[in-house]
């Protein structure tokens, strides 16, 4: 059996810093794994962008990770998963692990059959999400809410400011009035707002995200690779955005001081 400190790195990308919530769970699940993370912060948020643009960016970012040795690519973004994972799987000869809003576990957790989903416009309008609802919502009522502005708050590491709290209250209020007892965080950025969201919705509402489940899936896909070793694996970070400006939010969200590298120009893209 191989030891993770000697294998190729696992590659992870997101529209920005939200995917760090998934990276954190992967590191917890596979502490000896070498990890490479790319934040496409020049183009965040993906939510309002078209599928073709997201597909181009996803191919570029996955290509960068493969060029740097990744043998598994994790799309730590619900919007990019919905728009680009089928194309990535057609284009790349390696495992691709994506995100999926936790509608299935939410249906099991709900006591009254009313589930709320907070996500981006891109995720909520995708065929993938529609298929997910068709599959799991026959016996429950699913209420959705797009959340413009929340991704940007997380990108700034503004996790509990008056502005962020006001947005969370605005987006959860109609779901609470409708009586949801289970709330799905359908965007990896929103996981960083979980303490605030739980404080706003109260203890009677169960909040669910899929980060830990995705990390377990990554370990399963890794197959014969051990999840432990003699030392912790390294983590390297890149961004298409302004690395100097993003360093402070990255350190705040990751929980430690790390180096942030700039993507080479050919991977940054020119226009939306």
Segments from the language model and where they lie:
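Non-catalytic structural scaffold of enzyme domains
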Residues: 1-272
């Amino acid at each position: 059996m191989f030891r993770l400190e000697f294998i190729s790195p696992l590659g992870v990308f997101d529209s920005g810093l939200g995917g760090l919530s998934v990276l954190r769970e992967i590191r917890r699940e596979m502490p000896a794994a070498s990890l490479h993370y790319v934040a496409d912060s020049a183009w965040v948020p993906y939510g309002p962008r078209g599928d073709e643009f997201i597909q181009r960016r996803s191919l570029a970012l996955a290509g960068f990770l493969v060029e740097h040795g990744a043998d598994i690519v994790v799309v730590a973004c619900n919007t990019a998963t919905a728009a680009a994972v089928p194309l990535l799987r057609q284009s790349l000869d390696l495992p691709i692990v994506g995100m999926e809003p936790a509608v299935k576990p939410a249906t099991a957790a709900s006591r009254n059959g009313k589930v709320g989903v907070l996500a981006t416009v891109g995720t909520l309008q995708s065929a993938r999400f529609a298929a997910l609802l068709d599959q799991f919502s026959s016996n429950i009522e699913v209420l959705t809410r797009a959340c413009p502005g929340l991704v940007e708050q997380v990108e700034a590491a503004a996790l509990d400011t008056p502005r962020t709290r006001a947005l969370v209250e605005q987006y959860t209020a109609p779901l609470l009035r409708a009586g949801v007892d289970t709330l799905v965080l359908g965007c990896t950025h929103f996981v960083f707002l979980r303490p605030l969201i739980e404080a706003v919705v109260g203890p009677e509402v169960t909040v669910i995200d899929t980060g830990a489940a995705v990390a377990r899936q990554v370990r399963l896909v890794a197959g014969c690779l051990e999840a432990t070793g003699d030392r912790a694996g390294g983590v390297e970070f890149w961004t298409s955005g302004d690395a100097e400006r993003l360093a402070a939010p990255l350190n705040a969200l990751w929980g430690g001081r790390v180096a942030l590298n700039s993507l080479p120009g050919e991977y940054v893209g020119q226009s939306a």
